[in-house]
């Protein structure tokens, strides 16, 4: 069970916004680039300032990014805006945004740089394995337990927690370690889904 499974409900809430954007000639690629720009600017601010209180921004930005990601996909599918450029922007934008938003954790007190870098590597690996499924079987794998939406929830809550209770940063490295394990588990599950689907075919 992952947050990805409640995506249809989230999309239904966003559908009026999607129609408004379409009416005003906003394209899926515009939304994708806006999400990327927001992530890069937020990540840069968090890294340069390196103040725990600013991590209050993280859950807000992650929620906005999640909404923008849903909107760009809806515009592409439902408004006939699917393009090869859009697919490239979507996949690369997701990975770059993840790095931009989670790399600032490295600059928090009590954070072990190697653990944060390992976590980011596992994040990229997880997305690569999801894409690998699409390359082999034609269907992208969103297997959990620690997909993009789940990461946004957990890291957003942690950003909120350390902003309000800075003393909780003593647990940073435990969270990065657990996250890395869950990400590796997710990568394995996504590879397994490729093999299982291939066996069925």
Swiss-Prot record:
Its main location: membrane. It is found in: Cell inner membrane. The keyword NADP does not apply. Pfam families: CDP-OH_P_transf (PF01066). Residues 1-43, 108-116, 173-175 are periplasmic. GO terms for cellular component: plasma membrane. GO terms for biological process: phospholipid biosynthetic process. It is a multi-pass membrane protein. Residues 65-84, 140-151, 197-201 are cytoplasmic. Gene3D superfamilies: 1.20.120.1760. It comes from the Bacteria. The keyword Electron transport does not apply. InterPro entries: CDP-OH_P_trans, CDP-OH_PTrfase_TM_dom. One of its GO terms (molecular function) is phosphotransferase activity, for other substituted phosphate groups. The chain crosses the membrane at residues 44-64, 85-107, 117-139, 152-172, 176-196. Keywords: Cell inner membrane, Cell membrane, Membrane, Transmembrane, Transmembrane helix. This is Inner membrane protein YnbA. It comes from Escherichia coli (strain K12).
């Amino acid at each position: 069970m992952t947050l990805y499974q409640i995506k249809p409900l989230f999309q239904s809430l966003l559908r009026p916004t999607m129609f408004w954007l379409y009416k005003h000639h906003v394209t899926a690629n515009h939304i994708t680039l806006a999400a990327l720009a927001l992530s890069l600017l937020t990540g840069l601010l968090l890294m340069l300032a390196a103040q725990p209180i600013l991590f209050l921004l993280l859950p807000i930005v992650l929620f906005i990014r999640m909404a923008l990601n849903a909107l760009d996909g809806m515009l592409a599918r439902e408004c006939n805006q699917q393009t090869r450029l859009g697919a490239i922007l979507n996949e690369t934008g997701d990975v770059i945004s993840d790095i931009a938003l989670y790399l600032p954790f490295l600059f928090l007190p009590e954070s072990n740089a190697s653990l944060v870098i390992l976590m980011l590597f596992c994040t990229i690996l997880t997305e690569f394995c999801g894409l690998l499924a699409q390359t082999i079987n034609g269907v992208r794998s969103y297997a959990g337990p620690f997909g993009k939406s789940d990461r946004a929830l957990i890291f957003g809550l942690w950003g909120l927690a350390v902003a309000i209770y800075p003393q909780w940063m003593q647990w940073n490295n435990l969270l990065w370690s657990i996250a890395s394990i869950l990400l590796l588990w997710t990568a394995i599950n996504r590879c397994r889904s490729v093999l299982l689907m291939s066996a069925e075919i």
